[in-house]
Curated annotation (Swiss-Prot):
UniProt GO molecular function: GTPase activator activity; zinc ion binding
Sequence similarity: Belongs to the SEC23/SEC24 family. SEC23 subfamily.
Record-level GO cellular component terms: COPII vesicle coat; endoplasmic reticulum exit site; endoplasmic reticulum membrane; Golgi membrane
Function of the protein: Component of the coat protein complex II (COPII) which promotes the formation of transport vesicles from the endoplasmic reticulum (ER). The coat has two main functions, the physical deformation of the endoplasmic reticulum membrane into vesicles and the selection of cargo molecules.
Binding positions for Zn(2+) per the UniProt entry: 63, 67, 86, 89
Keyword Transferase: no
Matching CDD domains: Sec23-like (cd01478), Sec23_C (cd11287)
Keywords carried by this UniProt record: Cytoplasm, Cytoplasmic vesicle, Endoplasmic reticulum, ER-Golgi transport, Golgi apparatus, Membrane, Metal-binding, Protein transport, Transport, Zinc
InterPro entries membership: ADF-H/Gelsolin-like_dom_sf, Gelsolin-like_dom, Gelsolin-like_dom_sf, Sec23, Sec23/24_helical_dom, Sec23/24_helical_dom_sf, Sec23/24_trunk_dom, Sec23_24_beta_S
Subunit structure: The COPII coat is composed of at least 5 proteins: the sec23/24 complex, the sec13/31 complex, and the protein sar1.
Name of the protein this chain belongs to: Protein transport protein sec23
Amino acid sequence: MDYEALKDQWSDVEDRDGIRLSWNTFPSTRMEASRLVVPIAAVYTPLKEKPDSPLLQYEPVTCKAPCRAVLNPYANVDVRARIWICPFCLMRNPLPPHYKDITENAIPPELHPQSTTIEYQLARPAPAPPIFVYVVDTCQEEDSLKALKDTLILSLSLLPPNALVGLITYGTMAQVHELGYTECAKSYVFRGSKEYAAKQVQEMLGLLAAGPRPNMPQQPARPPVGPAARFLLPVQQAEFQITNVLEQLQRDPWPVANDKRPLRCTGVALSVAVGLLETSFQNAGGRIMVFTSGPATEGPGHVVGPELKEPMRSHHDIDRDNIKYYKKAVKFYDALAKRAANNGHVVDIFAGCLDQVGLLEMKNLANFTGGHMLLTDSFTSSQFKQSFVRVFDKDANDNLLMGFNASLEVLTTKELKVTGLIGHAVSLNKKSSSVGETECGIGNTCAWKMCGIDPSSSYGVYFEIANQGGPAAVQPGPQRGMMQFLTYYQHASGHYHLRVTTVARPLSGPTGDPTLAQSFDQEAAAVLMARIAVYKADVDDGPDVIRWVDRMLIRLCSRFADYRKDDPTSFRLEKNFTLYPQFMFHLRRSQFLQVFNNSPDETAFYRHVLNHEDVGDALVMIQPTLDSYSLEHEGSQPVLLDSASIQPTHILLLDTFFHILIFHGETIAEWRKAGYQDQEGYENLKALLEQPKEDARELIADRFPLPRFIVCDAGGSQARFLLSKLNPSTTHTTGGYGGGVTSQTIFTDDVSLQTFMDHLMKYAIPTCFTIVMNDANPPI
């Protein structure tokens, strides 16, 4: 099968099962697996939308303990004897009574060959309706606060009618609003400079009275009972009160001197929000949505002092360990994040500020709980408003496209073991025979909790081969390795659902089996390696991580390239490997690993989003797409992400996922400024100028978070966003004297892709390794 046909096959599997594997044939032995360099791993999107798939209204059939695998198309079913053999543990299980009518030609949906992914609606109801607690920063300008209030009031109409809503505001003090008290505005005030233990919060709010017990769930869709009912009200009953309270919100009255920052107690407000839900709604789906317009400057979790002369920490400060508040703040927010994750509650962070807000310190609140993270310049921006509204997108049945209180468990056959997960989750510390000896990401477990989950939430799951090799290792007949992903989550409709995805792939034959190399999915592999690199970058120095990326690339090319000894020019890669070095070139230059020109908050945001998206979107972040428009051809033409693609008579459309940029070449910009497009006879120029805008609108249509939209001209200041992403094939050092200018010259010391590939070829050929060891500054 040729590469294009394989790509189509992998794409069909992704559409059906929401999964992409780095290797689609598994090695037979651990030794063979170690020689692959790129680990056996999967990018899995549990809730990938499948509108044609039926929702089964009965409980799944599971194998006996301790296996607990769910019946799937790979199970061997004996219709006459009414038994099925589990492909994971090979145990025989009786079929339940309601399967009595099945025959060879009439089988239930979960046994159909195409039902490798199936979803069940479980009988177990959710313990409470979805809960939304808005935590609002009042230390902001009037116009920004008004815009935020308007957006929050609008969001009330997007919530399910039975959803519970609470409101906490904070500035110098944190206030919990008692929405159930209608006589006048009433709130409980917490001092911003004081750290409150969980029990203190609960005592002050009067939450220690008898409430719903964890093992006694209340009826779904009913309003809460007990003390929490004063603070959390159903939208359908209390929309008027909640709207009134939001409309009456005022700026924090505490005076702020010109040389000071506002006193902002973000840590106390978050601590109170976590404590409020922890007592009354443990393991019930809920979201704490934080809207902050500046850094925390007092109380627990503050990231900078109130004096403006004291700057926010930079990457340089962190590298030099010149960080006065950082470690204490991280410890505080991490403890809150663990509490929220253990209770099944999501924390979303929405920042509307030109300066940093402390996202770096708070990042694990979102990372541990599967929350959203959004970085915008202001709450007045359309980027914030449209992104926030998209959080509440609904499906065809008018249910929110979000799952609550989710967990993911991975089962494997004896050939495979799970080594870990990289994504927005925490470990459930569940041990089983599927758990591997090594650790990659969040390891030593086969189950993870990811309180918040949506249709684009994707996770990198990593595996190892269990077989040590030896004479008994290779067994006769076709062999396969299998994995099953079990995702339990609270659906927005009020019931728990279970989505089951079962994956089977062949095992390779003897050492040197060519099917192994042919099964390499370079796109999935690039994204999975990028996740490992970002995971490492959070704990290691940036240069060390880049060196690791380079080493892995050299080893992979050395293993799978064709070349002649001592001849770098003979270096060739098969079609399914050719783009991988290019992906790694752009990854090592990306904002995920290069922190220069980015604040720590921006780096935390970019890495958060990368770990949330599937293969297609993550690849756009690593290697942006570039399209060209000109009068010579109709529509857009994909072009190389290279400085040579900049032409005076062309318009370029760059998509980096975070930015959508339209760049007008020098001549096009002059024509536009002269107004030719508005004159008769120049309709083709007008159409040319409009086409990239139309395409940009399509790109923006379903993207979260909404990207920043930039329109610029050659030579303009905003053009730097494009130039920083291009391969610098034409720099100030490469142009010949007096040569004609046909492309943009980029002033940079970065090496070009061609130079990078030249060095890769030298390093990948073992006998050439000594030749390049004497290079002064090898780029790889």
